[in-house]
């Protein structure tokens, strides 16, 4: 356990909060960091995973050993019934739902849109934008009851477009539009909706792009020069923003996109 982990235990933003947080995509880089941070800051957590059962079991065991209330459930969020079942599981197991974090989504290759056929774009919309809607819609009643919060992890690319990122920015842009609409409509019930837009990270999808060669050394150098802080972020940086927006400390913030990108979108 690191010093940062110990600081998480000192910060109990969610201590005593009735119910649980649901994190969609809890075995991904950002998702797992968010699960850990929420749990260590006092929240019960249920997270979803699609196929990586081994990682889900390991994360659950790790946090339970620390005394946290953590459970996982397999769910294909492109399936409307499975997404709704995940919401019911959180409410049934923990009594209420106070936070919903969408940190799921498919791997997104770096490719020019001219090379993306409509069928591939349709699949991306289904696997990301529709998956988010499948999850958030059945959660509304529970979130109204708790005056809860939704945080969608999107991308900084919706505010400053990098070439070959249209598959990500287009579908995540649609998620952001839904978030703003829900913020306007659900605020009367005390429910808040926000987005966190990651920039280039050393883990998560960005790490996979580097590993498979879609981003070579030259591209990485250019990217780093475009970031005022001259470095890449981490999943921990994103989780910090997510948990802040989900907490009562952000109680008057809704309908916003918070870029966590080292200044890339400046």
Language-model regions: role of each:
Residues 84, 105-122, 164-167, 207:
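Conserved mid-core segment of classical short-chain dehydrogenase/reductases
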Residues 106-107, 124, 149-175, 179-188, ...:
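Catalytic loop of short-chain dehydrogenase/reductase
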Residues 187, 192, 253-255:
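Short, small/polar-rich loop/turn modules that mediate ligand/substrate recognition or access, typified
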Residues 188, 195, 199-227, 237:
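A glycine/serine/threonine-rich, flexible loop-to-helix segment
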């Amino acid at each position: 356990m690191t010093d940062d982990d110990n600081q998480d235990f000192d910060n109990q933003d969610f201590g005593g909060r009735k119910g649980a947080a649901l994190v969609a995509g809890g075995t991904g880089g950002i998702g797992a960091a968010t699960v850990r941070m929420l749990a260590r800051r006092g929240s019960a957590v249920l997270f979803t995973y699609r196929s990586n059962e081994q990682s889900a079991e390991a994360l659950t065991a790790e946090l339970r050993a620390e005394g946290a209330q953590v459970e996982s459930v397999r769910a294909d969020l492109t399936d409307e019934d499975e997404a709704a079942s995940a919401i019911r599981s959180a409410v049934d197991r923990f009594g209420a739902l106070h936070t919903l974090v969408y940190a799921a989504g498919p791997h997104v290759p770096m490719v020019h849109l001219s090379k993306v056929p409509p069928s591939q774009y349709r699949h991306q919309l289904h696997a990301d934008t529709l998956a988010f809607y499948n999850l958030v819609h059945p959660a509304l009643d529970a979130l109204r009851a708790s005056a809860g919060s939704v945080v969608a992890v999107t991308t900084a690319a919706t505010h400053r477009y990098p070439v070959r990122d249209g598959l990500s920015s287009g579908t995540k842009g649609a998620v952001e539009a839904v978030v703003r609409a829900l913020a306007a409509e659900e605020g009367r019930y005390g429910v808040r909706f926000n987005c966190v837009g990651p920039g280039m990270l050393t883990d998560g999808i960005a790490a996979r792009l580097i590993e498979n060669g879609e981003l070579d050394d030259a591209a990485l150098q250019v990217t780093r020069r475009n970031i005022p802080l001259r470095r890449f972020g981490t999943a921990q940086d994103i989780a910090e923003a997510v948990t802040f927006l989900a907490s009562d400390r952000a109680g008057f913030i809704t309908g916003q996109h918070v870029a966590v990108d080292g200044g890339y979108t400046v």
